[in-house]
Every structure is written in structure tokens, then in C-alpha cells.
Amino acid sequence: MKASLTFSLSGIYAPCSISRDIYLEYGDKKAECLYGTIRLPQYGPGCTPGKIVHCVLDDSLPFCSIVVPSKLFGFMPTQPTMDFCYFEPILDNVVPVLDSVTFLINEQLYSKLMDLPQEMQQIQFLHYKYNINSMETVVHSRDILTSGLCQILNCSPFPQGLVDFTETQLILVNDTEQKLSALKYANEDEEYALPKIGTNSALSIDLESLPCTISRDLLRPAPHINDDNSIYAFTDAETLLRLDVTSGSFITVSNMGCVRLVKLFVLLLPNGFKKRTIYAPPKIIASFPDCSVVTISKSNIGHTDIPIANQVFISRVGGWLQSQKCFQNIILTTLKKFFSESKRILCQNDLIPIAFDSSMADLNIAEENDESDDEDELGQYYKNDSLVWFFVTSAELDCFSKDNSHFIIDPNRTKLITTNITNRRPLPLSRSNLQRYYGFAETFYYDLHIFPYVRQLVNILETSFNCSQRGITLNASVLLHSTTNNVGKATMVRFASKYLGIHLLEIDCLSLTSNSRQLDSTSKIIGYIRAKCENVLPYASPAVIFLAHLDSILLDVNANQDPEAIKLQKSINFEMSKLLDDFTFKFPGTTFVGSVNNIDNVPSSFRSHMRFEILVPVPSEAQRLRIFQWYLSSHELNRDVQQKVPVSYMDNISFSSLSSYSAGLTPLDIKSIVETARMTATARFYQESKKCGWLPQSILITQEDLSKATSKARNEFSVSIGAPQIPNVTWDDIGGIDFVKGEILDTIDMPLKHPELFTSGMKKRSGILFYGPPGTGKTLMAKAIATNFSLNFFSVKGPELLNMYIGESEANVRRVFQKAREAKPCVIFFDEIDSVAPKRGNQGDSGGVMDRIVSQLLAELDGMSTDADGVFVIGATNRPDLLDEALLRPGRFDKLLYLGIPDTDTKQLNILEALTRKFVLDNDVKLIELAKLCPFNYTGADFYALCSDAMLNAMSRIARMVEKKVSQHNELTGENISTRRWFDKIATKEDTKVVVKMEDFLKAQEQLTPSVSRAELNHYEAVRANFEGA
């Protein structure tokens, strides 16, 4: 229900007072109090989480009234406040009791509380100081109890609930980081004395765009229903007082000779707006596109002083949407609705924004449907997603007035005439976020300090625009390319154009390729692009022509193709190059931008016409963190949510761990992760509400939701998107590696944990080569490295790199290293590297493909120690003597680690313990005795086979025992039950428990043959001596 609201200066946990009518309607006559949820209106879309409060009856309050402490909503009522709220009772007064409440305490206060001899005395302090009463007071996360002294950090398991001194754990945390020093109630520092009224006839003040539309319910005084809401501006009460005007009065906003009339309203507390700033809608901001500071002054003009225009001439502002015939009817219909629903106040040279639903264009709403109610019936289904502008060219008035520039458009008296098209630059993003204001799906906001490739594109577009303003022809063109799909090439172009205020003409070339291999396809494709752009560009400058998926129509000519196909391909390549030059030369200030996935497929003849090429990589860790923050922001989480419950995330979410674990994923994958986590949190929300019998005030996404969604995304899309996975092999799974482990920590752990030590120019060691007999754990060791240091893991096999086409094998090597750089920190593991990189000159393959692979591998390894932080290369081989000698030089595989056969009983014991740590061993098993029985030419793989055979022997022995028990049971009972039925109905846990005995190990050891003979072992030792001696 909607109730009148008054804020008091009482303590934060003072009971809220309610009038008798509310108490009688919702309260229990037997109960002494009532619990309910108070939700304040907000300046923006969606709804805010409500606060559960403890309410008491106050007979002195007027009808349908509530009094609430202002501190509960984090502000002091020094200015006009909101005077209504939404109240919902808690059914059956069931408010959950919290398990724990964490308080952040000032250092001095914390030390004094810790000096108290009993914990109960600390609870009594909170009780008397902040009026926290057991099983009565409702506390909320982030409540400020005292500015600079005490705040509630967290409530568990719900963000708000009752405190029970006998059950709720109260946790006091010392504020050692001085976070409380900057924590205050909003408006707390303001004096209660009013400022001097009318001290300035004009004020210089900041002008900013409203972030969203303001509900009429928040306008004080309430305006007339026919008032023009496109000229409403807002500011704080202090500014109104200094200007000596009341809320709802006309004022003038001026700068550099431009004067606009606005109706100024007060912003009610609480709100998140800045003080001494005037907030205006986009229509007013468009009149001051380059002015962040304006002069406001009191106006003596009333509504009756503004004349009504007889005729008004408006022209369309050039742009992509205005040039599309399919949108003309819906645009004109929306324009007509804009002028008919209110008496609009306009001025010559005004820009009028018109938002419309482009999906309604298919319904072909005609202009002549004046007397039809179809438009009103469809209005509830509108969801605006596009914006066009109109420009007021001139107006005809009957008479002169006090204000010669402004006039009113009366839908019953004024004739509106649309004329030609005019050119106007769009508003840059820094002046107005039009997508957020009108509720459109927002384009991701790139931080130019974190995304250098976006900064490069912005700089190119900005330079091109500035040069065209000075009459300098730059003819800029940019080719965006990437090695992975869905990295945001189109998004960055849309952002850059909005950020700078540049028209965008976007064409997806995939829609042009259905008949791209026919003889007349070239003329059709070129004709379509020319027709779409040439009609717009004369009235849309500066502009960006963006052709997405350009490689779908441009292909490099292959000599093996059909001659007709070659001719066709050369034709379209030539025509596209000519088109590029024509547009950039004929329309100064126009920048051509194309995007491709694989730049190697773009013909060199076309690439030579592109001035700039920008590589768009997979996001780095810092970039992924920013993307997670964007998609977990309030405006993104609550967009297109049908439910009324707001969605947010827990305060303890670690964005750094999310960004680290999501290495190699694209922005689209991160968006999918957040959507999956939101759905999981929503399902849990309704399940918990059914269990506890009440509906929490918000849906909270937890760290576990995001972690599970990230793991699911990596598992599902690892093959399709090429994202590597982190294996699950720990040091405990490997035995006898103490020396090798120490060497690995020095090589890998040091650069990861202390990168500052290598800033002086010292090169990192990024290459490790494991060599030794087969079965000694080289592959297992590489996986353990990736797991221990949380590194992504690429395993590369030799045959995967080979390709029948010339140059493709080396390209495969480049792709492997490129994927690793995109997924860093990462380990590239080359198993049996001697088959990939043998000595050059000794191979008999035609074409020398192996030699070229070795050369490419050497080139990639040379960059590992300098510009590839977090990428480590590990090779494994049984025959290091077959490797090309250049691989073993410093800067490449400069760390050679020999993984030999365990040659002592202790090492063999360590391996046995690692392999059997998950076994259930009998008391008679003595692993040290077993190790003494094993010869010293057993490899790690041999010990793995020994333990596996022992487990198999134990299972066979238990199977025979079970069969014997089943046979005895059938003889005693006369039944004929099967073994499966016996397990289902009669068997106990002891019958299914596999216990490995010493006899199982001894039997397995007798049957085991070593995989490495003594002679072979001597050969490997000789190779080791040769390498270590060298």
C-alpha cells in the first residue's frame, strides 16, 4: 500500500510509528507490534530492496501515515524529503532470525570493548547504545550505526533479520584500515540553518544529463497533466533557495548566447545526485552539447506569457534510421504522439529526441489511423530501442511576447510541417547516456586505460574528425581483426562512435553473402552498400561506416581455384577497394571500419588500402574483471527482469578470482556466466522463500553461483572456443619429486608471485624440458605444475601440428602460442617433443615441413622470456639427443630436468604412498617391505601398474568370496537368488568394501615385468651424463 511518510531524527533502530488504520488493517490485535517492509520510491527504473522494520502504533498520526528514522536509509533530513512510501506487512509477523551479524568497529572503540571482562557486556553496550533489542530489532547489512564509529558489515544468512542474543553470533571486527573514517550519513555535514535567500540573481552551475526519466510521483509540486515534461530540470533545495525560486518555477539556462527555458524541480532526499548541479533531459542537453557549466537565472515568464505557434517547421536530423523507409511510419506516429500528449514548449534550433520501438515497424502503423484506438492498445507492448532526432527550423507566431524565442505547440491549433533533412552531430556519451535514459540495451562502457586497443580506435576516429573540421582530408580506414570470435569488435565500434558523438552506419556482410558466388553478385553487393550509405552520408557527418564480417565477401585468391571463381573474387576485391577510396574521399570526416576474424584470409590488395590494423585480443585478466563488474552492475542485472524483486550480488564476491579463473573466455562467455548465475540465484530465492515462509527483499548472487557457472562454461565451451582447462593433478599424486619440485618453484613460482623482481631487464626462464626414461611421470609433472599454480594447460601432440598445405603447419604452431597468450597464465606442454622438433637437415620429408616447424618453434620461444608474461613452455622427451640443438640454448628450453627411475627404497616408498593414498589397505600391508622387494629399474608407470593390479587382485578375491556366500545362502535357505539380488537385498557394507592386502601386492609384483631393462637404463644414464656434463 502507498502511505504518507515522515522522517524523524531518532536513532537508527528506533521503532517506526504507524497510524491506527494501518495497524488495524494489517496488525494482529493480540500482538504488540507489527513487522513490515518499507520501500522508498527511487529516481530511476526498477525497484529498490525494501527494509524490514519494527512498527508500533501511534494514535496521533494522521490517516495512512508512517514515521521512519532517516538514519535507517543513510541520510539526514536537512532538505525536502520523499513524502510517501510503499508499505507491505510481513505475513504472520514471521521475520527470520540471523545466524550472525558482523560489526565494523572504530579502533579506539574496539580496544575498549575488548577490555571488557565479559562478552555479555559487549552485547549490553550494543543494546543500550544502539537500541538493539533481542527478538525485536531488525538489523540490515551496511547499516551505519554511528558515523565514523560503527557499521554493520554483513548479516547471515539473509541481508536483514532479527537479532537473538542467545542464538545470533555477534562478531566485532577492528577497523584497522580506517574505512569508517570516510563513512557518514548523506547530508550529515550540512547545517540545519537555511542559506541566505535570493543572494544571487544568476548562478554559474554544472549542467549534467539526467541518468533516467523521473516519475511524476516525485515532482513537488505535482505538475499539470498537460505540462511539457521534456523541459523538466532538477537540482537540490539549496540551489533553489539561492536563486530565490520555488520548485516548479520557470528559469532560464544560458551559455554562449544560447538561452533555454526550463521548469526547475527540487530533488527529494534520499537521492544519489550531486549537489550544486542542475540535471536536465537530453532535449535541453542537446542545446548545450559542449557546455558543462551554464548560467541559470530566475525567469519572470509564466506559462500564459508564451505564445502558441500557428505553424512550426521541423526537419529530420540525418542518420541511419531516418534514411530507412521501413521506419518512417512508426517514427512519424511516435512524433505525432509526442506532440499530442502535451503542450510542448519549444524554441527555434531546438533538437527533439524521439524514441520508438523498431520492432513495431513491421506492423506498418499508418499515419491516418487518427481515430483508431489500435495505437493506444499497442502502447502497452512498446519497448523503445531506437532514437531519432528532429530539428526545429522555424515557427510562425500571431504576436510578440515577453519571450520572443519560445513558443507552445498546441495539438489542436498548431500546424506541424516536416521539411528536408539537416545535419547535426550526435550527443557524445560524456554529455548524455541516451541508452540508459530511454531504457535501451546499453553498449558496454570501455575504460580506455584498461582497453588499449579501444583507446587506439577512439584516437583514430577523433583525429579523423578533428582533421575534417579543419579542412584536412585524412581518409582514415581501420581493419579490426582477431584470432577468436565474439571478442567484441562490433561492440567497440559502437562504443567509440557513441563516446565521440559520431554517426554510425553499420552493415553486416553476412547478410550479403547468400549469392556471393554468382556472376552478378559483385554489382549487387557494391550497389547495396552504396545505396545504404550514399543517401545518408551527406546529412550524417562525421560518420563511421562499419562493415562487420568483411571476410565473408573478401577472400584471398587461391591459384588452385576455378578460373571463373578467381575472376569473380578479384572483381569484388577491386570493387570493395574502390568503394573504400570513394567514400573516404567524397565524404570528408567519414571513417571506414571493417572487422574480420582471420586477417590472413583478407586479400593483400584490400589490406593495402586500409590505413590502420588493430588486433582485438581475448580480454586480459584486468579486462575480464571490468567486464564482470559491468554485467554484475545493478542496471545490467535488473534489465528485462519481469519479477519485481531486485537482483544484486553478495559483498564478499571476489572479482579478482573470477577474472583469474575465466582466462581465455570472451566477453560473450562472461555474459553467459552472469546470466547462468542469476538464474541459479533466482531459483534458490524461491526455494528458500518456500522453506522459511517469507519472501526476502532481493535476489543475491553468491560467489559459488558464479564459480559454478564459470566452471560449467569452461567445460561446455572448451572445445568450441578453444579455452584450455586447468587439470586436477596435485603434488600428492606424484612421489619422489622433491628435487625437481624445488627447481620448478624457482622457475615458475618466482615470476608469478614477484614480477617486480624482473623489471630491471632480467629475462625470465619460461622453458623447461623434462627428459628421461618412459613412464617416469613427465606428463603428470606438467599437469601438476598447472594445477598447483592455477595455470591453464595446453597439451600439444606432434601430429596435431602437421598439415598437408604449405605454411599451415607453421601457422598451427603460431595459433598454439597465440591461444596460450590469450589464456595466460598458461602452460604449453609438448609431449614427445623430439617428434615435433628433430634436428634440422636430417629429415627426408619433401618440402622440409619439419625444419620449418622447428624454425617457427624457435621464433615463438624467443619471445617467451620477454613479452609473454605468464606463458610457460614445457617439453617432454625420452630422447633429448634427437632434439635440435638450438632448442636447448638459453632463452628457450634453458632448464633441463632429468626425471629418472627411483633408485632408492625411500623414493620407491614415496611413489607407493602417493599411488595408494586413496586405497583401503589392510593392517598387514607394509609398503616399505614391498619397496624392498622391487628392483631399481621399476619406473613410476610400473609402480602404477603394480598398484592397479593389486587393486584388481583384491576385487577378484572379494568377488570369489561373494560368490561363495551366495552359494552358501542358497543351500541353507533353498532359494536360488542371483548375485545382483544378493547385493541389493542381503549384502552389507563390509561385503562391498575393497580392502587391499599384502598378498594382493605380492601377487601383482610377481607377475610384473619392468618396462625399462637394465641395458636401456644404462643408456639413459649415459645420455644424462652427456647433457649434464655439457
From Swiss-Prot:
Pfam families: AAA, AAA_lid_3, N1_PEX6, PEX6_4th. SMART domains: AAA (SM00382). Its EC number is 3.6.4.-. Residues 478-683 are annotated as: AAA-cassette D1. InterPro entries: AAA+_ATPase, AAA_ATPase_domain, AAA_lid_3, ATPase_AAA_core, ATPase_AAA_CS, P-loop_NTPase, PEX6_4th_dom, RecA-like_PEX6_r2. One of its GO terms (cellular component) is cytosol. The keyword Cytoplasm applies. Belongs to the AAA ATPase family. This is Peroxisomal ATPase PEX6. The lineage of its organism: Eukaryota, Fungi, Dikarya, Ascomycota, Saccharomycotina.
